[in-house]
């Protein structure tokens, strides 16, 4: 199935020192220089954004962030940025970003998907053509890595147990052969799982893991 709509993707990014606190300290074998945590968070974000920008279903990526380093990196990759003007947490930031895109088809994407492949996102967005609001559960089945809305409000409900909340709000759960899209990184175990799938070049360069194949 080929995506028909042109999707605007919104990615939220906290300030680097405040993000992914369960990854600090890095596990043995994945440790690095003193700023390794911030560099890892930035690498996860960069690989996620780069994969999204490479999907033919995506017309643009907008990152909502107040972090200067994150903003500079994703801008270099070709994404737009807006500041987190609401400053009230993840879901208001996503709503702000969705409005800022000006698009009718908007997808909220987690910022920690280093194993995401462009073709996985393309396939998921094609599947999302089936309903006004759809979501992709994470690998555990309890969280959400992708939420889509076409011609309707995004109404994000990210956070612990978000899959159940999105389903209760009328969004349709999508499943498919997209392990990289489902593999968000919150813990050292998640990170090892992503490395086993093959991560993008930014994360691979930082941690010495296997980069995912291109093409």
From Swiss-Prot:
Keywords: GTP-binding, Nucleotide-binding, Nucleotidyltransferase, Transferase. One of its GO terms (molecular function) is phospholactate guanylyltransferase activity. Guanylyltransferase that catalyzes the activation of phosphoenolpyruvate (PEP) as enolpyruvoyl-2-diphospho-5'-guanosine, via the condensation of PEP with GTP. It is involved in the biosynthesis of coenzyme F420, a hydride carrier cofactor. HAMAP family: CofC (MF_02114). It holds the Pfam family NTP_transf_3. The keyword Metal-binding does not apply. Phosphoenolpyruvate binds at residues 144, 159, 162. NCBIfam families: F420_cofC (TIGR03552). It comes from Geodermatophilus obscurus (strain ATCC 25078 / DSM 43160 / JCM 3152 / CCUG 61914 / KCC A-0152 / KCTC 9177 / NBRC 13315 / NRRL B-3577 / G-20). The keyword Flavoprotein does not apply. This is Phosphoenolpyruvate guanylyltransferase. GO terms for biological process: F420-0 metabolic process. It catalyses: phosphoenolpyruvate + GTP + H(+) = enolpyruvoyl-2-diphospho-5'-guanosine + diphosphate. Pathway: Cofactor biosynthesis; coenzyme F420 biosynthesis. It comes from the Bacteria. It is an enzyme of class 2 (transferase). The lineage of its organism: Bacteria, Bacillati, Actinomycetota, Actinomycetes, Geodermatophilales. Its EC number is 2.7.7.105. InterPro entries: CofC, MobA-like_NTP_Trfase, Nucleotide-diphossugar_trans. Belongs to the CofC family. SUPFAM superfamilies: Nucleotide-diphospho-sugar transferases.
């Amino acid at each position: 199935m080929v995506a028909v709509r042109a999707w605007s993707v919104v990615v939220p990014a906290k300030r680097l020192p405040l993000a992914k606190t369960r990854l600090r300290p890095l596990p043995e074998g994945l440790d690095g220089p003193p700023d390794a945590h911030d560099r890892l968070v930035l690498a996860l974000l960069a690989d996620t954004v780069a994969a999204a920008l490479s999907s033919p279903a995506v017309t643009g990526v907008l990152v909502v962030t107040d972090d200067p380093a994150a903003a500079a990196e994703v801008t270099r990759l070709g994404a737009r940025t807006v500041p987190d003007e609401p400053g009230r947490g993840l879901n208001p930031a996503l709503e702000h970003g969705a409005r800022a895109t000006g698009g009718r088809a908007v997808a909220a994407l987690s910022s920690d998907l280093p194993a995401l492949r462009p073709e996985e996102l393309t396939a998921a967005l094609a599947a999302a053509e089936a309903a006004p609001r759809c979501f992709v559960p994470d690998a555990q089945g309890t969280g959400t890595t992708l939420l889509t809305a076409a011609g309707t409000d995004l109404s994000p409900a990210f956070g612990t147990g978000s899959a159940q909340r999105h389903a209760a709000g009328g969004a349709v759960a999508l499943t498919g052969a997209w392990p990289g899209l489902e593999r968000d990184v919150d813990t050292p175990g998640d990170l090892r799982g992503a490395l086993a799938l093959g991560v993008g070049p930014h994360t691979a360069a930082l941690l010495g893991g296997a980069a995912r194949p291109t093409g």
